[in-house]
Amino acid sequence: MAINIVAQNKKARHDYEILEKFEAGIVLSGAEVKALRAKRANLSDAFCRFIKGELYLMNAHIAHLETANKYFTPDTRAPRKLLLHKKELEKLYVKVHKDGLTIVPLMIYFNERNYAKVSIAIAKGKKLHDKRADMKAKTLDREAKTAMKNRSY
C-alpha cells in the first residue's frame, strides 16, 4: 500500500539543500483532516519553529471545507503542533539553534495506516550561484537524456 501525497513543497527543494529528513505526526481537527483528504492544502510558504520546546508547523495553509462546519471557520494558517519523539526534538533543536540550520516541511501525506504525516527536513539555505549550478546540471542531464533517446543507430 502506497502513501497518499496531499501537498508538496517544491520550493523547498529549490531554495534549500536537504541534509536530513524526518517524519512527524500532526495535530489536526476533524474538519482539517477532511480538507486534507480533499487535497486542499498548500505548503509553499510554510516553515517550522520551536515554541516552548515543541515544534510547530507555521504558515501552512489548510483550507476550510464548506461541508464540514458552517458555523465555525477556523484559521487556515494557524500553527499546528508536530509530533516527534523527544530525542528527535532535541536533535532538531540543537541543529537549529547551534548550527544555524532551518527546518522545512517537504510534504503532507497519509501513510499506510491513514494517519496524516508531515515530512520535514533539516536544511541549509542555498546561495544564488548554487541554485544556478543546480539548474544548469538539470538542463544538461535533460539534454543528454533526450539526445540518447533520439539517437539513431
Swiss-Prot record:
Subcellular location: Cytoplasm
GO molecular function: RNA binding
One GO cellular component term: cytosol
One of the GO BP terms on file: trans-translation
Top-level taxon of the source organism: Bacteria
UniProt keywords, alphabetically: Cytoplasm, RNA-binding
Free-text function comment from the UniProt entry: Required for rescue of stalled ribosomes mediated by trans-translation. Binds to transfer-messenger RNA (tmRNA), required for stable association of tmRNA with ribosomes. tmRNA and SmpB together mimic tRNA shape, replacing the anticodon stem-loop with SmpB. tmRNA is encoded by the ssrA gene; the 2 termini fold to resemble tRNA(Ala) and it encodes a 'tag peptide', a short internal open reading frame. During trans-translation Ala-aminoacylated tmRNA acts like a tRNA, entering the A-site of stalled ribosomes, displacing the stalled mRNA.
Family the entry assigns: Belongs to the SmpB family.
Protein known as: SsrA-binding protein
Organism encoding this protein: Sulfurovum sp. (strain NBC37-1)
